[in-house]
Amino acid sequence: MSDRLFIFDTTLRDGEQVPGCQLNTVEKIQVAKALEQLGVDVIEAGFPISSPGDFNSVIEISKAVTWPVICALTRAVEKDIDVAFEALKYAKHKRIHTGIGTSDEHIKYKFNSTREEIIERAVAATKYAKRFVDDVEFYCEDAGRTDNEYLARVVEAVIKAGATVVNIPDTTGYCLPEEYFEKIKYLKEHVDGIDRAIISTHCHNDLGMATANTFSGVMGGARQVEVTINGIGERAGNTSLEEIAMILKCHKGLGIDTNINTTKIYPTSRMVSSLMNMPVQPNKAIVGRNAFAHSSGIHQDGVLKNVQTYEIMDPKDVGIDDNSIVLTARSGRAALKHRLHVNGVELEEHKLDKIYEKFLILADQKKEVTDADVLMLAGADTADAHAVRLDFLQVTTGKGVKSVASIGLDISGQKFEAAASGNGPVDAAIKALKKIILKQMTLKEFTIQAISKGSDDLGKVHMQVEYDGSLYYGFGANTDIVTASVEAYIDCINKFKKED
């Protein structure tokens, strides 16, 4: 059994089926190039017959990338295969991915057919695709609900017809991990000629088991996995590329390797999230904002002593600069002391006790406490010499008029004021702030999130800015979203000022 696992990325095909996440051709090329840098083996670039846009995207992606196999999806229909081959004409390495439903539900209700007719159509499609390309992948749609004996007959028939990869999708996300393992194992043991083809997994996440099923399939003998960045995909999504890659990296004893450059995982995740306008849930494994963040006092104390106490991965392995100690109401004194130390503040124990009491009150109000907040608690006399703090903010806005903002900042004890107008209160406030902070900062990401449902409750703003070629993240929380936005921007400023 080969120890090489091939990564088939379907972000640009299955992943793009998420409502509202469609990309244009230029954006798809950006993602394809990032996937090439990431090290995926196969890029499923689209379903060419489905639309002129998909057809054109497959053509342009084929031109743009060099070494990955470019794959085009079809049904078991000759016209589909003709169009797919035409779209792949510029690809250095071509694959046609054809197939048909094999479960009784699909055979009876979708195709109004019989098991024998489905096998005939499967063989015919495989042979037809083989006339155009050497590399043909065949998918048995809804294989998860197809009985193993019949599935083995289909797989054996298409391998004899020339299929080089056989895809066993859990299309509905129904399988249990042990069932999927047994299904793959059954094919390995009962299909004549199975060693002439690679078995591929393609698992959906309807019951939250996509990654578990995919991993079980690998353990059963599959040597290609079909995955997406951030686990995006139709309905509840697909298996996450980053999760499979890091499972195998962390469990080296399995002896299964991929070609993935894991340090590219996080940047690729951010790119896909941004282009598709689909935020990654904060607690998403590997790439979520909180994946390497620790807020529990017990956990924080352990991580500060030795990261291996609560971290099984180095954040740098996935392209994140460092882990994050997130200060919340559950944080202990050790975490607060650490954040003060990082910001150059050393306090005697009795002073730390007083600040910790204030910190707990603030944390109950803000949920997450920033470095700027910690410095404010420590007092102006102990704050970083470059710390920027918001003194006041006044905004006038209304329908049919431009918003006007006046802002006051305290920078190292000096007071500064400015005013500006803008398209909306946040724009006006940020423009006023920029009149004081004369830095060429580019806003890269701006996210507003309500912490709870009430109109008078806190809103959170997460912001990413680029300054002098580096990215900085800021956070603000306030019952007023404009103030929260300004606090997030100031948080970014304070972070890059520490490096000046």
Outline where the language-model segments fall.
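A mid-to-C-terminal "edge-of-domain" accessory segment
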Residues: 4-5, 11, 246, 253-419, ...
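Alpha/beta enzyme core
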Residues: 5-7, 17-42, 55-64, 78-199, ...
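Short, small-residue-enriched loops and turns at beta-alpha junctions
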Residues: 14, 18-19, 47-52, 103-105, ...
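Non-catalytic terminal/interface segments that mediate subunit docking, oligomerization
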Residues: 17, 22, 30-31, 368-472, ...
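Short beta-alpha connecting loops at secondary-structure transitions
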Residues: 67, 169-171, 226-234, 249-258, ...
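Catalytic alpha/beta core domains of metabolic enzymes, predominantly
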Residues: 175, 181-305
